[in-house]
Amino acid sequence: MDPCDCSKSGTCNCGGSCTCTNCSCTSCKKSCCPCCPSGCTKCASGCVCKGKTCDTSCCQ
């Protein structure tokens, strides 16, 4: 289950990219976050969307 349930506080489109509007979520699944590609082990448990690349500036 996605820990970021944007449907409770806004809208979240998890397709090719993750776009949340008016959402109070601070994290989302790697599959929903553009900064965490499917092969990114750094974000295996989730990530905070800070960028579009898989590095320390993206995930924390």
From Swiss-Prot:
Single GO molecular function: metal ion binding
Binding site for a divalent metal cation 6: C36, C40, C43, C59
Protein residues bound to a divalent metal cation 5: C33, C35, C36, C49
Residues engaged in binding a divalent metal cation 7: C49, C54, C58, C59
Pfam families associated with the record: Metallothio
Binding-site residues for a divalent metal cation 4, renumbered to this chain: C32, C33, C43, C47
Stored InterPro entries: Metalthion_dom_sf, Metalthion_dom_sf_vert, Metalthion_vert, Metalthion_vert_metal_BS
Chain positions covered by the region annotation Beta: 1-28
Residues annotated as binding a divalent metal cation 1: C4, C6, C20, C23
Keywords, alphabetical: Metal-binding, Metal-thiolate cluster
Residues reported in the UniProt entry to bind a divalent metal cation 2: C6, C12, C14, C25
Origin superkingdom: Eukaryota
Keyword Metal-binding: yes
Keyword Metal-binding assigned: yes
Domain notes: Class I metallothioneins contain 2 metal-binding domains: four divalent ions are chelated within cluster A of the alpha domain and are coordinated via cysteinyl thiolate bridges to 11 cysteine ligands. Cluster B, the corresponding region within the beta domain, can ligate three divalent ions to 9 cysteines.
Homology family: Belongs to the metallothionein superfamily. Type 1 family.
Biological function: Metallothioneins have a high content of cysteine residues that bind various heavy metals.
Name of the molecule in the record: Metallothionein B
Protein's organism: Gymnodraco acuticeps
Lineage: Eukaryota, Metazoa, Chordata, Craniata, Vertebrata
